[in-house]
Swiss-Prot record:
Its EC number is 1.10.3.2. Belongs to the multicopper oxidase family. One of its GO terms (cellular component) is extracellular region. Keywords: Copper, Glycoprotein, Lignin degradation, Metal-binding, Oxidoreductase, Repeat, Secreted. Cu cation 2 binds at H31, H73, H439. It comes from Botryotinia fuckeliana. This is Laccase-3.
Amino acid sequence: PGPTLYADWGDMIQVTLKNSMPDNGTGIHWHGLRQYHTCTEDGVPGITECPLAPGDTKTYTFQATQFGTSWYHSHYSSQYGEGMLGGIVINGPATSNYDVDLGVYTISDWYYTPVFALGERIAHSQAGPPSGDNGLINGSMVAPAGQTGGKYTTNTITAGKKYRLRLINTSVDNHFMVSLDNHAFTVITSDFVPIVPYTANWIFIGIGQRYDVIITANQTVGSYWFRAEVQNGCGTNNNNGNIKSIFTYSGAASTTPSSSATPYTGRCTDETGIIPFWDSFVPSGPLSGNVEQLNVAINIGVDASGPIVTWGINLSAIDVDWKKPILQYVLDGNNSWPASENLIELPNAAQWYYWVIQEVPGNVNGNPVSINVPHPMHLHGHDFFLLGTGVGTYNNTINGPSLDYDNPTRRDVAMLPAGGWMVLAFQTDNPGAWLMHCHIAWHVSEGLAVQFQG
């Protein structure tokens, strides 16, 4: 990954990007940063800007209105899968004490074939995405069996100290369960949101999500494995079970761990019981009436060149125009944008909007087929309130009463369960054009996104 960017809460941040690539355009998105009243700085080609052309330079300017951990990455198709990403640390209060900040810990899948070539292959194949060839922790990993080279990321800790570790899933396709052998995590943030601390031996981290955890060095002096494992239904990786890093106590006789994993039950769903540290409440009245629904589905058709795979919302795969970003329409007062922009207007400021996101059967060669896949849904420009999730089809009469309006989970990436639903809410308090999309890079490049404008 690229260098980690550091700032303090409230700072004005300026970052200059130069595109030194010979062919591709690019643009940098500051993941999770709300860009409050600075939509032009969101860094999304075709939405808030034109791609930055080879040889050109652009300076992004925005304020750190949140604090915690995040990452920046290219938003030019699946380009970030080649490593065009890095961590962001914005210093601010913490909900639990610690002695040492170990910084960001990026966890990612890795492919030996260039991601643009893979993306084109996936878009024209009914076989689904390929397995990752390996995983990387902070950009490093030992090569799989039968290959040579590489190394584990290593960390040295001192007995009796407490360490803050900033976990970020920067993958293209893989979600992970993560753990440090013999050491519990005290979890203190969920994305950019400080939470009431809770303890876990393993945590699930979907693509784009972040968790800050505190590790207490209270075990026998030695070396211990940190593990990142892909679960069934959460993507596939050819080196699964061997994606690790090493934590070694000062004074340990060996830097090679012999520790064993804590048993756990695998899953591909979000952490539960997350309670934001500062209370927020969502009005419950509007959801008693009509509910806006966004249906997520795959479509596989065939043309003269073979299969064509798209993912869409409400039967439409987004198709943006890099030559004319949607923000240009908005600034010009022109609402004659193409329907393929998948733009939903939210005309009223300071209004609460409620959305049911539902995975529905797709269309494969003209036939309805259920291809149930979990989707990490990411919203730009806002933290959303996650009122509930479930499997099957959402029914407001049955599921509505169980939705949580009293200080619900708040974040910017949440997992839509495979074949299931999620209900989220946010207030229109940040003018602009904001993308909401699946953060599986193959899916968003195949169209799984909408825009909110208001």
